């Protein structure tokens, strides 16, 4: 292969070059018709060898037959979802459609059979399903975490709505609260968030009651030109073109619901529509929760007075969050249904060609049982079924030889300490940076908690979307009861502030370590690109 500006090889082209890690003869790699790399294998420490056991997809995610470049790209895509420490520079991780496209582009070694190619794709998709659709307090860029954040935000907004009602003395405002059902209120008291209560947030009558009451709420609470014009049209008996109807609600039309029911001007409505089209409002909700303010109408002057302004702001944000919550749940169900169809089709093809693979006839029945489970019309069981599938994969790949990508990763690390390698794509560059930081000790090694401690996953229901054990509270004056399970308001407020302070300090330390690793890595390199044959 042609070298670019800098030669990291030594000696002539040899028919066979073998790299063996010192004191570890099982870690060896043989390259044919290549020159020898100008690296010292004695620089590889025992800590690096231990940490390298999770730096390739074939070692960590049990894939087989992939080429090194594709193995690295797949490993980087899944590693970003394992922990927030591996997310770089605010980069958005892959959604299901992008990951399915990645699986279609994967290339395998020529001798890899069709059975193991399908098995590798199913294995990668199983890991993706567990990482993307099961809630984890550490994750920020998954759709399940977005769904859980919306639940946490709605729980706080409904609690604040209840507090505003208790402070209200006007009969007109009390009438307004009577037509808006509050799922947090049970017999006059605020209910603690449970899965049953949080599922009630998704009910149709809650959504219809809030979304169809905008004209009445705005006419009572606000006296701006927009609300006065809408009230005047009602007085004249004219139809308001921006009013939402039941048919619009059932079809989830953002143009009718979002742009016309949230007291936004044209510029704000277009910006909000762009946020929803891009990531279903995930970045909008995350930024609002980190900055401790409302997603919309945070600093906007509206309402007849201070009290009415607070009610209208909370009401509009409840409408937005209810809409996003239903859209996100619809996307989750759609994605899990697509994953189930993929598994049914792939497992049926694997079952037909399993006879061509020696020693695997005994697992045919297990594959058929898993395939029948994926055909059940319950999308929320798909992540748990993926875990059952991974248990079968561990048996299937136990007798298949690896491609020695672990040694390639160590050799790549030695090269990165000297020069900058020519990058093939952004995903490959990301994989190199993460592996380099882990081997240098700037980041912890990866660990799949659902594989090392699978018992806790059997307690999950509905993909754990309604779990409140990781909630930390949204606003300083509205702390959910899930924070340490009740107690007086002052105690819960102090615990909330201490928890938020620990989270901020932890994030600051993670950013500082990542930046330190980046500075050291760039300082060690010679800014000259090169290409190597094993990549």
From Swiss-Prot:
Family: Belongs to the herpesviridae U4 family.
Full protein name: Protein U4
């Amino acid at each position: 292969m042609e070298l670019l500006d800098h030669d990291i090889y030594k000696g002539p082209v040899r028919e066979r070059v073998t790299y063996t890690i010192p004191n570890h003869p099982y870690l060896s790699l043989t390259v044919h018709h290549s020159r020898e790399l100008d690296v010292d294998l004695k620089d590889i420490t025992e800590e690096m060898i231990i940490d390298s056991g999770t730096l390739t997809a074939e070692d960590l995610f049990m894939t087989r037959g992939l080429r090194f470049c594709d193995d690295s790209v797949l490993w980087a895509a899944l590693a970003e979802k394992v922990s927030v420490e591996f997310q770089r520079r605010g980069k958005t991780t892959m959604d299901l459609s992008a990951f399915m496209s990645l699986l279609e582009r994967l290339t395998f070694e020529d001798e890899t059979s069709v059975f193991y190619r399908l098995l590798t794709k199913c294995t990668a998709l199983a890991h993706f399903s567990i990482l993307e659709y099961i809630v984890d307090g550490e994750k920020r860029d998954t759709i399940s975490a977005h769904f859980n954040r919306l639940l946490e935000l709605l729980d706080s907004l409904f609690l604040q709505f209840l507090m505003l009602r208790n402070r209200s003395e006007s009969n007109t405002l009390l009438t307004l609260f009577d037509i808006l059902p509050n799922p947090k209120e049970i017999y006059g008291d605020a209910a603690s968030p449970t899965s049953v209560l949080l599922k009630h947030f998704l009910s149709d009558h809650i959504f219809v009651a809030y979304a169809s009451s905008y004209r009445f709420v705005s006419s009572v609470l606000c006296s701006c030109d927009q609300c006065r014009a809408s009230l005047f049209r009602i007085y004249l008996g004219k139809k308001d073109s921006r009013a939402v109807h039941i048919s619009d609600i059932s079809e989830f039309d953002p143009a009718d619901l979002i742009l016309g029911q949230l007291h936004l001007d044209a510029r704000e409505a277009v910006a909000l529509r762009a946020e929803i089209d891009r990531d279903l409002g995930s970045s909008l909700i995350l930024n609002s929760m980190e900055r401790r303010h409302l997603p919309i109408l945070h600093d906007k002057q509206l309402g007849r007075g201070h009290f009415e302004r607070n009610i209208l702001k909370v009401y509009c944000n409840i409408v937005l969050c209810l809409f996003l919550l239903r859209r996100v749940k619809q996307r989750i169900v759609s994605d899990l249904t697509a994953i189930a169809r993929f598994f049914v089709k792939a497992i049926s093809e694997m079952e037909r060609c399993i006879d061509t693979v020696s020693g695997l006839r005994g697992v045919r029945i297990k594959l058929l049982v898993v395939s029948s489970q994926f055909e059940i019309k319950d999308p929320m069981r798909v992540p748990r079924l993926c875990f059952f599938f991974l248990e079968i994969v561990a048996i299937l790949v136990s007798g298949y030889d690896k491609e020695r990508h672990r040694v390639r990763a160590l050799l790549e690390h030695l090269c990165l300490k000297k020069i900058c390698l020519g990058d093939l794509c952004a995903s490959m560059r990301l994989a190199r940076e993460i592996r380099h930081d882990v081997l240098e000790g700037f980041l912890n090694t990866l660990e799949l908690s659902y594989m090392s401690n699978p018992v806790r996953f059997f307690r999950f229901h509905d993909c754990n979307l309604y779990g409140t054990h990781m909630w930390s509270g949204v606003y300083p004056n509205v702390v959910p009861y899930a924070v340490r399970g009740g107690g007086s308001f002052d105690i819960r407020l102090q615990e909330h502030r201490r928890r938020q302070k620990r989270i901020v300090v932890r994030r600051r330390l993670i950013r500082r370590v990542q930046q330190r690793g980046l500075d050291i890595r760039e300082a060690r390199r010679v800014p000259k690109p090169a290409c190597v044959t094993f990549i």
